[in-house]
Amino acid sequence: MGPTRWRKSTHVVVGAAVLAFVAVVVAAAALVTTGGHRAGVRAPAPPPRPPTVKAGVVPVADTAATPSAAGVTAALAVVAADPDLGKLAGRITDALTGQELWQRLDDVPLVPASTNKILTAAAALLTLDRQARISTRVVAGGQNPQGPVVLVGAGDPTLSAAPPGQDTWYHGAARIGDLVEQIRRSGVTPTAVQVDASAFSGPTMAPGWDPADIDNGDIAPIEAAMIDAGRIQPTTVNSRRSRTPALDAGRELAKALGLDPAAVTIASAPAGARQLAVVQSAPLIQRLSQMMNASDNVMAECIGREVAVAINRPQSFSGAVDAVTSRLNTAHIDTAGAALVDSSGLSLDNRLTARTLDATMQAAAGPDQPALRPLLDLLPIAGGSGTLGERFLDAATDQGPAGWLRAKTGSLTAINSLVGVLTDRSGRVLTFAFISNEAGPNGRNAMDALATKLWFCGCTT
């Protein structure tokens, strides 16, 4: 039922009543204000003072007390001796001054696990525009108005086959459907789909990767064309991954075009081929955030290759590693002892020192490398987001550093790492890097206890 309509006469009556009421109010006001105050009528009370608003975000003070090296060493002595930490390497630094406050085996290369992604993110921030996007194209496979079309991948693993309006794992992902619409407007009638994944070179699996991790949802073969980073179930974080991601991307395009997906092949696009369609990934800064918060291995490998191509290195595992370490060295971040085989940290063959990891964080938090400052915002928040969302929430410690600590986590079998920045209870900003190899069954909890103790420390003596 629609709203009741008022008749014209109703409007007239109501309008007259309103005018009469206004006239009475005006007359009453005149009696009070023009003829002096009537007996028994009080003057209006003064308006209340505006409330004082406290800032929601307050910058840390440069004058906050710096912990002493002796105080930090004494405070961490017991927790750092926990046998569940196994072989522990670590370093703690004052963010503002760069002063080293604590170290243990900080120059000994150990398996860093996913904290390796800190180096990948740092190199990307130093090399690429934060708004950089990756283009996935479709070109004509020949000169005829009917014929094959070629899906040309450039390293965007987030391309999705989901229809418009349907969620995908990656926010802002490009869609196969948009490619199809453009192809249909191009005047070309596709008869087959081919996939050009030649932008990437070398092996698709890094040394030290376990093929079982494909089924476990940790990784997929790294190819220049992919759908949902190879996920079989696009919106499930630990979905089993495809072993043929480039072919799968072509098959999804073929299905959307009404062609036989089984007929999709791998082929190089003809030189100078006519572009029929193009879509773009989300901006780099958004993809970095997804990589760091979800510890996304496929994303890390593809971003490593973005750094590689930007400084004329091959888009391969070795090319990306060389590009990342070279870029950090150019920024005066010491990578001595680094021996890496991937950009994600998934391989057990990777080696990094706590010194390199902490130096990267100190560069981001300190005053000398403003291009790295966004790295701090990319880190998960203790008790709040990403891989730290469920950590540091122990009620017995009043939640400790929850909200005060941001860090990248790392976890492999018997390996734990935690690298980041915190504001201690004295208001001082500290950077830290902890790597634990040969860890015991409670190794992760022991590492959290180490970081919590540092936050509580305030060790000025």
Curated annotation (Swiss-Prot):
Pfam families: Peptidase_S13 (PF02113), Rv3627c_N (PF23714). The active site is at S114 (acyl-ester intermediate), K117 (proton acceptor), S295. Residues 1-28 form the signal peptide. Its EC number is 3.4.16.-. Coiled coil: none annotated. Keywords: Carboxypeptidase, Cell wall biogenesis/degradation, Hydrolase, Protease, Signal. It comes from the Bacteria. One of its GO terms (biological process) is cell wall organization. It is an enzyme of class 3 (hydrolase). Gene3D superfamilies: DD-peptidase/beta-lactamase superfamily. InterPro entries: Beta-lactam/transpept-like, Peptidase_S13, Rv3627c-like_N. GO terms for molecular function: serine-type carboxypeptidase activity. Carboxypeptidase that cleaves terminal D-alanine from peptidoglycan in the mycobacterial cell wall. May cleave L-Lys-D-Ala and/or D-Ala-D-Ala peptide bonds. Exerts important effects on mycobacterial cell morphology and cell division. Belongs to the peptidase S13 family. Overexpression in M.smegmatis leads to elongated cells and promotes the formation of increased numbers of Z-rings. This is Carboxypeptidase Rv3627c. It comes from Mycobacterium tuberculosis (strain ATCC 25618 / H37Rv).
